[in-house]
Amino acid sequence: MDHKAYMYVLECRDGSYYIGYTTDMRRRLAIHNSGKGAKYTRARLPVKLIYAQGFASKEEAMSAEALLKRKKRPQKEEFLSENQDRNLLSYFEESWGVL
């Protein structure tokens, strides 16, 4: 895989979504679940990675993050459903074992 950055969606313990971007998906997920990640996720642990999309640049990932964050929850759910062909979750599960 030749992705330099990722836009990702976490499902929090309370069922809410957190959307972010990173250049190191494994490290970022570990930071979130250690309680040292974003303030939003710290109060809603544990979090589960449900979507990750790769991009050629950090700027592209940041743009995708900003677009998805602006959507209301039903639109986010529609995006997640319609873009499963772009979801790298199975790649990460195979690479890391259980998420």
Curated annotation (Swiss-Prot):
Q: In this protein, which residues make up the domain named GIY-YIG?
A: 3-78
Lineage: superkingdom: Bacteria
Sorted alphabetically, which CDD domains does this protein's record hold? GIY-YIG_UPF0213
Q: Which Gene3D superfamilies match?
A: GIY-YIG endonuclease
Q: List the disulfide bonds.
A: none
Question: What InterPro entries would the database entry show?
Answer: GIY-YIG_endonuc (IPR000305), GIY-YIG_endonuc_sf (IPR035901), UPF0213_domain (IPR050190)
Which family is this protein grouped under?
Belongs to the UPF0213 family.
- Indicate what this protein is called per its UniProt record: UPF0213 protein SP_1535
